[in-house]
């Protein structure tokens, strides 16, 4: 509309779209992570693993795109780089645990958590809404659950992996809604 005047209905539709897009992006991240984990765990051929990992990497762009309209370009670029790093680290963690290399696994976990802290700090630096502990806590809870899922899966504890994945699905919806609210509060 000329002059940027939106009706109440258009504003509400825009808000609804933000929440929906953020939720979908985070759900895709966990679903493609699970698919990648399952392809590694099942010993799928390298071509399949590569294809799934490629699609998993696209989820970093999907999440970044939700933030792109509401953050400066340089910050969006930083966020994308951190999310790509996160996804790549997740893949490496899955492969390392599958190989049985516990020492490297623990080191990679520490780096993964440091990456999540960097994401929380970046968001907090841009938006006071994200400055509290909730941003970091939600991201760390997401990592805790993802780690549990990976460990259960690689230990053949499939029921526990599925149960934790169900809980993770609920958590990322909470995380997505929190992030969307923060973007609106900006």
Report the location of each language-model feature.
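C-terminal amphipathic alpha-helix
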Residues: 1-61, 92, 96-97, 101-186
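Mid-chain, structured segments of secreted extracytoplasmic proteins
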Residues: 57-91
């Amino acid at each position: 509309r000329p002059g940027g005047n939106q009706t109440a209905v258009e504003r509400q539709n825009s808000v609804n779209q933000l929440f929906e897009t953020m939720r979908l992006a985070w759900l895709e991240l966990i679903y493609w992570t699970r698919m990648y984990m399952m392809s590694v765990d099942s010993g799928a051929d390298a071509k399949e693993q590569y294809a799934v990992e490629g699609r998993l990497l696209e989820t970093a762009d999907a999440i970044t795109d939700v933030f792109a309209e509401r953050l400066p370009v340089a910050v969006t670029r930083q966020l994308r780089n951190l999310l790509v790093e996160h996804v790549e680290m997740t893949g490496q963690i899955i492969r390392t645990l599958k190989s049985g290399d516990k020492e490297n696994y623990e080191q990679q976990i520490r780096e993964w958590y440091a990456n999540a802290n960097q994401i929380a700090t970046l968001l907090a630096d841009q938006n006071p809404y994200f400055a509290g502990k909730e941003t970091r806590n939600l991201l760390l809870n997401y990592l805790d659950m993802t780690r549990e899922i990976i460990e259960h899966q690689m230990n053949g504890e499939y029921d526990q992996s599925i149960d934790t994945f169900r809980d993770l699905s609920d958590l990322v919806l909470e995380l997505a809604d929190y992030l969307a609210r923060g973007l609106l509060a900006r």
